[in-house]
C-alpha cells in the first residue's frame, strides 16, 4: 500500500479533486498501461492526460510514505514460537493450580470424579458440597472487583501504572478462573487457556513493538496454543484459530494479518502441545472408551443424534442469554450489586450437586464416568443421563451469567456426552432388544460411540467450530471410522444452530432499527462525531461496544496517522471559485478542502464553517458564488485558512490527536516530508471522525478476541 500513495500523488491534478483511492493488494495482479512523457511532464492512462509531478517529489513521497513496512518473517515466526512456549508453560501451571485447589477443597478425594458423592452418606458431606462452590464464588467476586478497579485508566496510556494494570487484569482473570474451577463450579478450563494465550500474544507483540498485523497474527497463534495445550491436540488448536479468529476477520478486512499467519499458528500450536505434554503427560484430556461401528446403516441414526445435539446446543445458548438478561435486570432494576451474583452462582451449584454431583467440575473425569470408562464405577441410566443434561445446562448458564470465570468447552463435552449416551442406550433398547421392532438384523453400535459423536456435535453447535470439533475427536480417537458419523452429526448440529442464530439476529436487528429509527434520523442531521459512530454501530453491529468499553478505548502507540487518515480529499487554489470549491467538497463527501498553489504546495485548509461565516458576514454586494473566490474568503477571515499545524503519515495517531485537541482543530492536513519544511505536499486529511472510528474498531477487535470464552 505504501507504494500506491506516490502513484496516486503522481496522478492527481493540483487543481482538481482527488479521484484515486489507494490500490489495495489482492490475489489477482492489477495491470494497466502507463505512458510516461519526460518531455511534456505528463502521464497518459486510458487516453486521459494527467500532470506529472517532478521526479524529486515522487522520490520524496516514496521515502516518506513507505513507513508501513511489515516486520521480517523470521522475527514473526520466532515470536509465534515464543508465544507457544509461554502459553504451554502457563497452561500447565494453570491446570496444576486448579488440581491443587481442588484437592485442597475436597481433602484429596481420589480421582474418581464426583461419583464418590453418590456413594458417600449425604449427611456427612452436604455442608462441604454447598460451602466449597459458594466460597469459590465469593473469592471470584472479590477478584472481579479488583479487576474492574484495575481496568480504570489514569488517562495516560503510556504511564507505568497503566502498564502494570494491563498486566494485572489478565492475571486476576486467570486466578478467578482457577478459583472457579478448583471449587467445582460448572464451567471449563479451555476458555481461560485461550485467554492466557491471547494475553501472552499481546505481551509479546507489545514487547517487540510490532505492527497491528503482527499483533493480530500472534493473537491467532496464542489462541491455537491455548487449545492445543489444553487438550494436547495441536491439529484441533490450529483449526480453532482458523475458525474463531482468522475466518471472521478475513470477511471484513483482508489486510488484518500477515501472509505467514498460518505458519505462525501451526508452530505456536505444536510448540504449546509439546510443552503441555512434557508438563501434564502424553495422555489426552479424557480417556476414549472402547467403541465400535457395526453398520453403515446407522448413519441416519447419527444424523438424528446431530439434530438432537443441535437442539441441546440451542437450549444452552438461549438459557445463558436469558439468565444474563435476568442478572442485568436484577442489577439495574432491583439494585442488587454485581458482587452478589458470583456467590449466588456458587451456592446454586452446591445445592444442585447435592442431588446431581456430576455437575461439579472435576476435570474430565466426570466425562469418563458418562462414557463408562472408569473401572469399578457403575454406569448411569438413560433417564439419569437426560436429567444431567437438563441440570448441567441450567448450572452452566447460571454460572456464566453470574460472573464466574470459565469456558464452554468442558460443559459442552459433558452435555453432549450425556445426551449421546442416553440416545445410544435408547436406540439400543428400541432396535436391538424390543420385540416390537423386527429389526434384529440391524446391528447398533455401543452407546459409547454415540456418546463420542454427541460430544463433538454439541461442541460444534455451542461454540460454532464444526471443523475443530471433528478434528478434536478424530485426533483423540485416532480412528478414521469415526469420521463419517462425526461429519454427519456435526454438520446437522451446526446447521440447526447457525440457522436459528441468523434468524434470531435478524429479529433483533429489525427490532433495534424499528425502536431507534427516529434517533437515527435525528443523528443523521447532527454533526457530532459520537452520533456518526453510533449510526455506524446501528448498521454494523460487529463494531458496537457498550459504553463502559467506549470510555476505556485507547490508541496504542504503534498506530500511525496513515492507518486512520483519508486518502481521498478535495484540493482548491486561491483562484478557485466558491461554487467550484463547494462542488469538490460535495464530490468527496468532506467538509473541508486543502488549499494548494500551482506547484501543489500546501497553503491551508478551507472548511464549510469558513464559508458559512463568510456568507453571514458579507452584507453588501450581489456577487454570485461563482464570482467569489477562495482568496476572498481567506483574506476576509484574517488568514484563518492558514493552519500552522500539520502532521505526517508516520506520526503516532495519539500524538496527532493530542495536537488536534490542544489547538481545537477539527481537521488537520497530512503532509509528506518534514512538517517544518518550507515546501510540503498534502497526502491526506485527518479529522476527528477518522480517529474515532479507528479507535473504536481497534478496541472492538481486541475486545472480541481477548474476551474469547468458549
UniProtKB/Swiss-Prot annotation:
Keywords (A to Z) from UniProt: CBS domain, Chloride, Chloride channel, Ion channel, Ion transport, Membrane, Repeat, Transmembrane, Transmembrane helix, Transport, Voltage-gated channel
Protein name: Chloride channel protein CLC-e
Domain CBS span(s) in chain numbering: 565-624, 640-702
Coiled coil: none
Basic and acidic residues composition bias: residue spans: 502-511
Stated family: Belongs to the chloride channel (TC 2.A.49) family.
CDD domains for the chain: CBS_pair_voltage-gated_CLC_euk_bac, Voltage_gated_ClC
Domain of life: Eukaryota
Biased composition (Polar residues): 520-534
Major localisation: membrane
One GO-annotated biological process of the protein: chloride transmembrane transport
Catalytic reaction equation(s): 2 chloride(in) + H(+)(out) = 2 chloride(out) + H(+)(in)
Family matches, as SMART domains: CBS
